[in-house]
Amino acid sequence: MAHKKAAGSSRNGRDSESKRLGVKLFGGQAATAGNIIVRQRGTKFHAGSGVGIGKDHTLFALNDGVIKFETKGPKNRKFVSVVSA
């Protein structure tokens, strides 16, 4: 007969690795072509002039300039553009 009660096993202890999403360059900061501006899931921020969008919705600078954030349109969408300095 067992003199020790069987130990339970936990079903917790898993968590996904953080994806380091968010704004990488803020309004007024200088950007060079190819710089990542925003890493995001979906289009929380939309690409304005001088900004490209990757297949994972990452926004990046297409040319050198200064970052500008603005809201436009009837749905108040957030746009990011690169304005030449």
UniProtKB/Swiss-Prot annotation:
Keywords for the protein's UniProt record, in alphabetical order: Ribonucleoprotein, Ribosomal protein
Regions crossing the membrane: none
UniProt cross-references to InterPro entries, sorted A to Z: Ribosomal_bL27, Ribosomal_bL27_CS
Signal peptide: none
One GO BP annotation of this record: translation
GO molecular function, one term: structural constituent of ribosome
Pfam families given in the database record: Ribosomal_L27 (PF01016)
Span list, region Disordered: 1-21
GO CC term (a single one): cytosolic large ribosomal subunit
Gene3D superfamilies: 2.40.50.100
Family: Belongs to the bacterial ribosomal protein bL27 family.
NCBIfam families xref list: L27
Protein name as it appears in the record: Large ribosomal subunit protein bL27
